[in-house]
Amino acid sequence: MGHVGVATATDIRDLVLRAREAQQRWKRSSFGDRARIIKRFHDLILERRDRVLDTIQSETGKSRRDALAEIVIVAGTARYYLANGERHLALKRRRAAVPLITSAEIVYKPHGVVGLITPWNYPFLLGIADALPALLAGNAVVTKPSELTPLSAVLARDLLVESGLDPNLALIVNGSGDTGAELIRHVDYIGFTGGTVTGRKVAITASERLIPYSLELGGKNPMVVLRGAPLAEAATGLLAGAFSNSGQTCISIERVYVEEAVYDQFAKQLAEKTSRLKLGWSKAWDVDMGSLISKAHADKVSSRIQQAVDAGARVLAGGKRRPDLGPSFVEPTVLTNVSDAMPISKEETFGPVVALYPVRSSEEAIARANDSEFGLNASVWAGTGTEAREIARRIDTGSAVINSTLLIYNSFDVPQGGVKYSGIGRRHGEHGILRYTQAQSIVSSIASGGGFDALLNRIRNERMARAVVAGLKVWRRIPWLR
């Protein structure tokens, strides 16, 4: 497909300096000027979609549909922040110490140079979608894509530049983990998407410099299916939730807790639907699931399946390698009889594998869903919307989806991120653009008599102090002054 050069420490330092210089001009531009470039970029990725799709598929081995999902979400992200970004960034007025004589406002200033370290599973989407709100907020962006999939990020950046962006405002540094570590030493903010182990290292390096950061890390995401739920729809939803992008999605479902009364029926439907999925690498739209990212990752996923089977797990569907299709293909797999002692029940597999667990009640389902060091996403299917919402609110995850599985990532007006070992910070919504800014509070007082502080300094005796206390008691009872 091509090749990219590996950035040295000197290269990274020099590129960040170039970005910093360009950002000084960019931050003075209007939101409208920035938005015009992002709008052209939105239109351009749709116009060049075949080239984008071909690049994504060639780097990752994913299906055409999964590649299209990357374009759809990037376009949706652009549209959302084009429509709402200026409002999120606008000056906000707040109450100050004393009405009438004091006032307060919040202004949002760009950090400067934002660094993004992005993974291989969605190389176009994650290579550019987080950069869009950062740019609209007035930052420059330097991205370090995965060494397994650098060309999708390079293409995204090239399309941004073709849309009119100063080339020094969106730069790419290629290399391994050491490249990312060096990038953190120079930027003003770092956003990382990837595994929990590496995320901890990112947090330590960023903390040493006292720069802000966000981490979207791993997940062992649960799904709850209760009696009264639409079982056929839940099984179909799980196909997407567990096997989209060959299961290589941070928010994908890996654990399913099914109420005993409907367990057998649900398991049968899921196994039948899973066995009908079409595997392959093709530009045709009828392929349901592509390959894993590499033979090494396929080896890891297959080993995890075999380890579970050797320990007593039962395969309801899939479970096999497909060397006839290529070295990186693993069938979409449904497991039962998985015990809590098996690593596959606790550790993220990041592949097309889902395990079913019977539960006696919704209380047991909630308890087992929460029995994880991760807390990224969850899915709930119940008899009524009220019941589903009550359960969703009790699951310890950054997001919970009712009657769907991956819907959170297309819901651009709400924050998306994790709790516990699944990360810190949020993308999307107001949070997704304000994280790229520093909030500055500006408070003011009338100058008469030396200002508000001087008024307090005029308290000279107990009678004056009692008068102040009495005034505070009255103040609490006046709603518009609280």
Which positions does each model-derived feature cover?
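Structural signal for hydrophobic packing residues in well-ordered secondary-structure cores
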Residues: 23, 27, 42-45, 49, ...
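Conserved C-terminal structural/oligomerization subdomain of aldehyde/semialdehyde dehydrogenase
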Residues: 1-4, 278, 322, 329-482
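ALDH superfamily catalytic-core signature
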Residues: 189, 197-339, 402, 464-465, ...
